[in-house]
């Protein structure tokens, strides 16, 4: 083990002996956008073409331990002989241009401050070490994307883990940021080490807007059936997938319900990066059933392309 990595693990072990804290100190409030809807209504809407112009953007290349991305104790992973290793992954941001409501992004991409990721002041030294931050290779900044789109009217997060909020610093203060319920309040000992970083990455966000999922776990975001938020808890309590009905067909952005291509193709949930592994497996199975029911859907896992 590298000496610095050993130090980090000692610090983390010490943190685990302490009371936990929330993921962030940023305030939350119930989102006013969207309406609760039954699952069957979403299924029926998929049959019609959608008005949204969709584009998937590669924000950065990266590499992190496979054991965080994938449950290596799953029988399929064991049978495949998968071992922990540094796994090449990508950070994506998705742009949604709605002809009536404006330009939105799913997740936030990479801020200009990460062009020299190893020296980014928002990320603490311990988090840089733990998450291989110096290995980030930015391909597109959120500032560049915002100029290309002519502005960004809102951000729909799949969850508030660091790698999904790294682009918010390029947006103007006051741009609304939407996330699932419970992510901000989630208590964990590891947040002792990560909360400062999360707060700094959310510095332009005065209040997080939390989706108000009902019993169906489905929200019709714009009220016109063009974009659906799907509660997919497990990786985090508020993890949310988004189904966009677009000019290029239905697009399902699943966040980190599974990070990798192998995970999606084999139905294996994330590993140590998930808050609740069994719940992750349930949510992943639900999203896979949706994709089987509607084979026209293009699926986008969190950090690798299919």
Which ranges hold each PLM region?
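Core dinuclear metal-dependent hydrolase active-site scaffold
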Residues: 56-57, 81, 86-88, 93-98, ...
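Metallo-beta-lactamase
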Residues: 21-151, 180-231, 249-255, 275-295, 297
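Active-site metal-binding motif and surrounding structural segment of the metallo-beta-lactamase
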Residues: 119-178
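Bacterial N-terminal signal peptides
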Residues: 9-19
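Bacterial N-terminal signal peptides that target proteins for export
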Residues: 1-10
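Active-site neighborhood of phospho(di)ester-bond hydrolases with catalytic His/Asp-centered motifs
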Residues: 105-107, 154-159, 179-180, 231-234, ...
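Divalent-metal (often Zn2+) His-rich catalytic cores of metallo-beta-lactamase-fold enzymes
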Residues: 220-223, 244, 250-251, 261-262, ...
């Amino acid at each position: 083990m590298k000496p610095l990595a050993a130090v980090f693990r000692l610090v983390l072990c010490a943190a685990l002996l302490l009371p936990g804290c929330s993921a962030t100190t940023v305030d939350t409030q119930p989102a006013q956008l969207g309406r609760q809807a039954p699952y069957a209504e979403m299924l029926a809407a998929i049959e019609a073409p959608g008005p949204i112009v969709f584009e998937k953007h590669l924000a950065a290349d990266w590499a992190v331990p496979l054991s965080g991305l994938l449950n290596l104790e799953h029988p399929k992973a064991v049978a495949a002989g998968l071992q922990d290793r540094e796994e090449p992954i990508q950070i994506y941001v998705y742009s949604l241009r709605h002809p009536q409501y404006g330009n939105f992004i799913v997740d936030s991409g990479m801020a200009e401050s990460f062009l020299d990721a190893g020296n980014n002041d928002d990320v603490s030294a311990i988090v840089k070490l733990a998450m291989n931050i110096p290995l980030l290779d930015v391909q597109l900044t959120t500032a560049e994307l915002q100029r290309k789109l002519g502005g960004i009217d809102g951000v729909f997060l799949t969850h508030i883990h660091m790698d999904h909020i790294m682009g918010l610093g390029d947006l103007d203060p006051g741009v609304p940021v939407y996330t699932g319920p419970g992510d901000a309040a989630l208590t964990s000992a590891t947040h002792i080490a990560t909360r400062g970083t999360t707060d700094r990455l959310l510095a332009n966000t005065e209040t997080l807007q939390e989706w108000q999922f009902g019993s169906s776990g489905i929200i019709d975001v714009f009220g016109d059936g063009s974009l659906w938020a799907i509660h997919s808890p497990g990786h985090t309590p508020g993890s949310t997938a988004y189904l966009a009905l677009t000019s290029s067909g239905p697009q399902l952005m699943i966040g980190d319900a599974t990070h990798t291509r192998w995970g999606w193709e084999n139905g294996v949930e994330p590993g140590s990066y998930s808050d609740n592994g069994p719940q992750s497996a349930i949510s992943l199975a639900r999203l896979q059933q949706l994709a089987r029911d509607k084979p026209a859907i293009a699926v986008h896992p969190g950090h690798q392309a299919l």
